Amino acid sequence: MKRKETYLSRDFRETAALRFPAQAKELNTAFDMRLSALLAENADASKEKQYHLKRQILPGIAAYETLQRVMPKEEALQTVHGYVEHLARTSHKQLAALLHIPGLYRLVPGVFVKSTRSVFGPAAGFAPKELQTGNGVWRVDMMKCPYHDICTEYGCPELCRCFCDSD
């Protein structure tokens, strides 16, 4: 069964094709092999954690490691950071456009809290600490984060900031 292409794998392939055309096929193969190995090593993770692993964490690690074959480590980090930042900007624009629909903005706080608790909860490997601040303000400190844990486990803790910066 073919894996669903993520934005990270799509952007990686675009970088390989545009910047390293002579090596693109080799880079894509290396990326695919590394991603397959990472997915196999993490196959026993919960369904909730798999959402983060498959969509962002593991493709990010595979792209970062593979890019280091053809560019310096810092450039590879900035390249992956650019992929994540581009998605964040696009998502922000889409949300901003939706909020122009009359009355929709009133629903956002409730939906945001509910979805955050679901997607970023303990089952996904997070340990959120909710801080009650009052006056309609909701704060969450993440005491444990699978993005940090997995990136550190695979020897690339610096990659975590790519994901954190997009929040």
Model-derived features with residue positions:
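Acidic-enriched, low-complexity/disordered segments with a strong bias for Aspartate over Glutamate
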Residues: D11, D32, D44, D141, ...
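Beta-strand-enriched cores of mature, soluble protein domains
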Residues: A45, K49-L53, L58-I61, E85, ...
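Helix N-terminus capping/helix-initiation residues
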Residues: A17-P21, P72, C145, D167
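Low-complexity, glycine/alanine/valine/leucine- and proline-rich hydrophobic stretches
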Residues: C156-D167
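Generic hydrophobic secondary-structure signal
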Residues: A22, A40, V140-M142, F163
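N-terminal, charged low-complexity regulatory/assembly segments
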Residues: M1-L67
